[in-house]
Amino acid sequence: MLDLIQTRRDLHQIPEIGLEEFKTQAYLLDVIEKLTTGKDFVQIRTWRTGILVYLQGSQPERTIGWRTDIDGLPIVEQTGLPFASQHQGRMHACGHDFHMTIALGCLERALEEQPKNNLLFLFQPAEENEAGGMLMYEDGAFGDWLPNQFYGLHVRPDLKVGQIATNTHTLFAGTCEVKIRFKGKGGHAAFPHEANDALVAASYFVTQVQSVVSRNVNPIEGAVVTFGVFQAGTTNNVITDTAFLHGTIRALTQDMSLLVQKRVKTVAEGVAAAFDMEVEVELKQGGYLPVENNPALARELMDFFDEKDGIELIDIEPAMTGEDFGYLLSKVDGVMFWLGIDSPYALHHPQMSPKEEVLAIGVAAVSSFLKKKAAE
C-alpha cells in the first residue's frame, strides 16, 4: 500500500518549474509502473514531462478524467522542514506535491478492480507558468482518451482539514497578463516643450484605466485591473522617452475578460493619441480561462460529498486567483473544488506547509467519488 506521507515528502523535495519536471516525472512513472504491474487494462502515455494513465473500462459508456498538476514554483523554501526542497530556489509552495500524492492514492484504489467506465489520470505539467493543459490539448496529447467529464482539486490553506468547498458556477477567475509601453520623446527636464513625456502619459493611463471596471462591469459581477509594475526614467532631470507598465486582468467569465481586455487596450491607445505618442499593448491570456464548473455535475459532486462522513461541504464564492484547469473545462464538462489543508501561510508563501493528515482524507473522498462515477 502506498505510503502517502512518504510519497508527499519525496515529491516535496524535488520541485521543478513547468516543462522541466524531469525528476518529478521519473518519480511518478516509477510509482505508477509499480502500482499497475499485472493490470492488463492499463495503458500509460507520456507527453513531454506529463503523464497520462488510462484504465480501460469493462463496459465503458464514457471516460471520467482526474487531473493533477505537478510543477513547483521559483521560491526559496523557508519551512525548515527536514524534507524541505533540495532544489535551490524551487518549492512546492502551491501544494502540487499534495495534489500528486492524492492522485497516486486514488489511482491505487481505482486499480483494485477493472472499472466499468474508462478512467483517465492526468499528471499535467506547467500549470503555473505555461498553461500546460492547453499545450497538451492543442498538441493532441489526449487522442481518443479525452474524457467526457473532467475533475480536479486544489488545496486551500484557509480551509480546515476535512472541508471541501466548491460551487455550481465559477471557482477561479480567468487571468490575463498585460504589458504596455508608451513611447514618447526624451529631453532635458528644463525644456519639457521639446520633449514628449512618456511618464506623464503612462501616469494619466493608470488613473484613467481605473474606470474600466467601475464603469464597464456590472457591480454584481467581478473583474480586476491591477498594474503592479511601473518603470520609467533613469535620473531626476531627464524626461524619459519610454514608460513600461506590467499588470493583470482578472474576470469571472470569459466574455467579461474579453470586454475588459478590449477596454484596457482602447484606453491605452486613447491616452497615447491624446499625448501624440506611440503605445504597444500586449495581452496574454493563453490557457488561463475562468474555471467554470458544470452546474449539474457540480451539484452531483456537492451532494455526494455532503453525505460523506468526515467531510464538511462549503458552497463557496469564486476566487480571483487563476488556474489553467479552466482551459480544459472549456473543452470538457467538469468540476474543480477546494480541499482544506489548514495552513497559517497562504499559497505561494515560502513557509506554506499543509497538514499531512489531509492526504488520507483526500484520497478517501476523491477515490470514492471516482469509483461511483466509474460504476455508473
Curated annotation (Swiss-Prot):
Enzyme class: hydrolase
Keyword terms, alphabetized: Amino-acid biosynthesis, Diaminopimelate biosynthesis, Hydrolase, Lysine biosynthesis
Record-linked SUPFAM superfamilies: Bacterial exopeptidase dimerisation domain, Zn-dependent exopeptidases
GO molecular function, one term: N-acetyldiaminopimelate deacetylase activity
Gene Ontology biological process terms in this record: diaminopimelate biosynthetic process; lysine biosynthetic process via diaminopimelate
Catalytic activity line of the entry: N-acetyl-(2S,6S)-2,6-diaminopimelate + H2O = (2S,6S)-2,6-diaminopimelate + acetate
List of catalytic residues: D69, E128
Protein EC: 3.5.1.47
Described function: Catalyzes the conversion of N-acetyl-diaminopimelate to diaminopimelate and acetate.
PANTHER family in UniProt: N-ACETYLDIAMINOPIMELATE DEACETYLASE, PEPTIDASE M20 FAMILY MEMBER
Name the UniProt record assigns to this protein: N-acetyldiaminopimelate deacetylase
Lineage: Bacteria, Bacillati, Bacillota, Bacilli, Lactobacillales
